[in-house]
Amino acid sequence: VELGPNGKKLYVVAGNMTQLPSPESSLVPKVWQEDQLLPRMPDARGHARSVMAPGGWVCRTDPEGKAWELVSTGFRNTYGIAFNGDGELFGYDSDMEWDAGSPWYRPTRICHAVNGGEFGWRNGSGKFPPYYADTLPAVVDIGPGSPTGVISGSGAKFPSKYQSAIYALDWTYGSIWAIHLKPEGSSYNAVREEFVGGKPLPVTDAIIHPKNGSMYFAVGGRGSKSFLYKVSYSGNESTKAVSGSFADGKGLRTIRRSMEDL
């Protein structure tokens, strides 16, 4: 659950095994179908054979949880979401590890969860390739892993590029990825940088401390020991607060948002 940029809405993310909560409205056109040009090859181990579109989803609701609106769909199993300085929403989506080596394997990836977006998860071999006109590609592919927490670098006492980054945690490979965004059209592309790494380092979630600007992250799970770590900057670069917003592409993002509101 993530508080929206205006402080008035709660954004809720759920994986492909979680049913939609019967939202009263939808920003996503409800045109999803399970028709396939070629017969689907279901998962050989039986995973999610009976789970149909729209897969994982993002909804937003009021603080009381009374009115729900569907924002974005087609995810595999996104654990965490966060907003950047432009008020744009990003998630770290899971892969289906049993698909590894198949033509339809989709690695863990960072998705720009635009209003009305469809990211193409379908069970078995039915997943949409990123070049399909009715789906959206990732901002950046990460690779095999187990996504957990996602946070914004806003408020961190770090150099400016790290304040503007999105941080994505991978439990399996013990990495906290700094996702450095670059505007592209009305969206973004990105490069990843391993900000923190260790083996083992089963990272679960993180937060930027609102007072001291350090990053705190937790590790543990599945029988491993739990710890809490703190990351602080020590160096000569300025840590003066930056907005994290991008001037490049601002006009196009404004147009896209106006279209999303139609």
What does each model-identified segment do?
Residues 1-262:
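Beta-propeller domains with acidic blade repeats across secreted/periplasmic ectodomains
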